[in-house]
């Protein structure tokens, strides 16, 4: 996990300033949130539906509803969602969750997603998603979108897409498919 943490943190860290607060929605064990807080000197809070036995000791918000983030409006500078949206079975509900993230963010939402570029990528996406998540009981509905589809969906639904970038992660998937970062800035 350490190699994956470092790769994810390298993508997210430039978008979080020292002293800012961030909420990691879908934080899992909190390993990435802890590492990101350490690197950026920011204050992390974890948020997830599932209680993990090995969850890192961070401030924690327990979700009881997958479509609602249990926090007040604009209560964190930044909201982070790492590989969360493709675990939501209905595409419409993915937008609800993204809107919830923006509701609690003062500045921006950082979304990292698996984004297959072609059919071969999609096959590897599905295989790795199943291998990495099935044993934890995490939903795996395979609701992936391409980078262009996500950018269009975000833009057409009122989000301001300030930055996007794609890369092939080395860990844990050995660069078999793409991840994309979307920086969604608060309007106004």
Q: Where would I find each of the regions flagged by the language model?
A:
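A short, conserved alpha-helix within the catalytic core of class I
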Residues: 88-100
């Amino acid at each position: 996990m350490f190699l994956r943490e470092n790769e994810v943190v390298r993508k997210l860290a430039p978008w979080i300033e020292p002293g800012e607060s961030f909420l990691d929605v879908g934080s899992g064990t909190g390993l990435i949130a802890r590492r990101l807080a350490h690197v950026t000197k920011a204050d992390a809070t974890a948020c997830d539906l599932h209680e993990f036995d090995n969850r890192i000791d961070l401030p924690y918000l327990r979700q009881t509803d997958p479509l609602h983030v249990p926090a007040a409006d604009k209560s964190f500078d930044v909201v982070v969602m790492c590989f969360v949206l493709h675990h939501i079975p209905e595409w419409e509900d993915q937008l609800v969750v993204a809107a919830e993230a923006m509701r609690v963010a003062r500045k921006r939402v950082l979304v990292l997603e698996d984004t297959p570029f072609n059919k071969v990528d999609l096959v590897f996406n599905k295989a790795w998603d199943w291998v990495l998540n099935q044993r934890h009981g995490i939903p795996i509905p395979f609701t992936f979108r391409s980078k262009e589809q996500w950018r269009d969906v975000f833009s057409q639904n009122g989000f301001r897409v300030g930055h996007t970038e794609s890369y092939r992660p080395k860990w844990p998937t050995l660069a078999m498919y793409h991840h994309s970062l979307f920086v969604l800035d608060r309007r106004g």
